[in-house]
Amino acid sequence: MSLDAIVIGSGIGGLTAAAMLARYGMRVLVCESHAIAGGAAHSFQRRGFTFDSGPSFYCGLGKQRPSLNPLRQVLDVLGESLQVVPYDPMGHYHFPDGTFPVYSNAERYREAVARITPEGAKELERFEKRLLPLYEALRDVPTIALRADWQLIPVLVGRYLPSLLKMLPHLGIIQGSVGDVMDKEVRDPWVRRLIDLECFLLSGLKAHGTIAPEVAFMLGERTRAGVEYPVGGSGAIVDALVRGLKRWGGELRLNAHVEQILVEAGKAVGVRLRNGDVLKAPIVISNATIWDTYGGTHSRAPLLRKEDLPQSYRESALKTPAVDSFMHLHLGIRAERLEGLTGHHVVVHNASQDITEPGNTCMISIPSVWDANLAPEGHHVVHAYTLEPFEGWQRDEAYEQRKKERSQPLFRALERVIPDIRQRLVLELIGTPLSHSYYLRRYQGTYGPAIAAGKAMFPGCQTPLPGLYRVGDSTMPGIGVPAVAASGILCANTLVMPQQTSELLVNLGKN
């Protein structure tokens, strides 16, 4: 089979890049090590329960046009769509001193804050007014039009000059942190804690480590488009991308573990699979993390040999700091007398501890409140997770006991929402950093790079090795579903002529 491109990994970044290239007419093969596509966004089933393995919070996936969500833009390009369920409030934050409802409607959100701290609500409004003009400027430049090389400049100047001019007053915060804006506008400690928490939920870092455009986009999109859950769970998103890939002639191969990226005469020329198969293509795109692509782990060799990259580049890349891994609970519970249950919750156990402390901040998703088909009749499906360091975890005789112990903060968090949850259990699955690393093939099971705003930038899709490109959460623009979809768009568009992208935009009516 003659191929134009091989994509390693079927996370959302990899599937997006592959499907876009197929849409452009390339012959593309995606090699996925796992038996299920989707990477951190895959769904899995146990005893009639359908679980999201990772993300469950989405906005801008529905029918509103135009959508600013890069993932929705890709689905439009592919001719695919999703059935979604809108909801509000979008969640509840449970602090030691009380529970706070979080609304996507900006006015209701500020009203809820004002009931706790009237002055803080005014400061929050000033904070949002500093960020939302950045969103208004960015919204006029669809991600689907962008690329990651010098040819972006004539595209921006030729098609989006008015939008660029709108950004000029905000240049100071585009590469700045949310913390910089917060320090200027917000003194109230409760609101500062709220902003830190929302940044942490987005990026894995607090306000001073999170770039301002990321939060501007979040604030704008959840207000404009609202929040939605895809019917069928996160796996429905993966299925739509796979359908789009195949619709345009691409191929997905499961249980196809890539052992090595092949390099000849200083160029990436293909891959070798664990079963010995050799596949050749002039373009290789790695959806593996920066550490797994360049450095490997104690149990997995890197995709590239040391000598395939400049030493200084490789060493610098492997010094990229990583966010911790996770403890997970995937539970099936009886649903009687839970009629008023809502779907998203965040529990902070100790206000005097840092919210990034493992076990202190726990995220909870109960998606069967929106899609009853995810659980057997009369039951709910529950996913809870919290940060957990990889260090010290090993599959020894103490492993099962340690799993039980380290999952207790998650159970205590769930008891804030469903006090008798332990008595409702019909299925209990505990995931550890080792689970995260094994199933997702991720270095130390990490959430992604801990690249703080103002300290460094996420690298682009290009690498020093001709023919090799990267997508996913260790490339620009970073962590999160919209971001990794954007990384796939940027990579795919960079590999075709600008005219091809322009024709795509004309066909979509986005020009």
Label the model's feature ranges.
Residues 155-169, 206-242:
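Helix-loop-beta segment of a Rossmann-like dinucleotide-binding subdomain
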Residues 259-376, 511:
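Mid-domain catalytic core of redox enzymes
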Residues 55, 473-495:
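A conserved FAD-binding loop/helix module that cradles the flavin
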Residues 96-209:
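Rossmann-like flavin
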Residues 188-203, 356-363, 419-477:
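A glycine-rich dinucleotide-binding beta-alpha-beta segment and adjacent secondary-structure elements
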Residues 218-272:
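Helical element adjacent to the flavin cofactor pocket in flavoenzyme catalytic cores
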Residues 334-434:
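C-terminal segments that line or cap access tunnels to active or ligand-binding sites in enzymes
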Residues 2-143:
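N-terminal glycine-rich phosphate/pyrophosphate-binding loop and immediately adjacent elements
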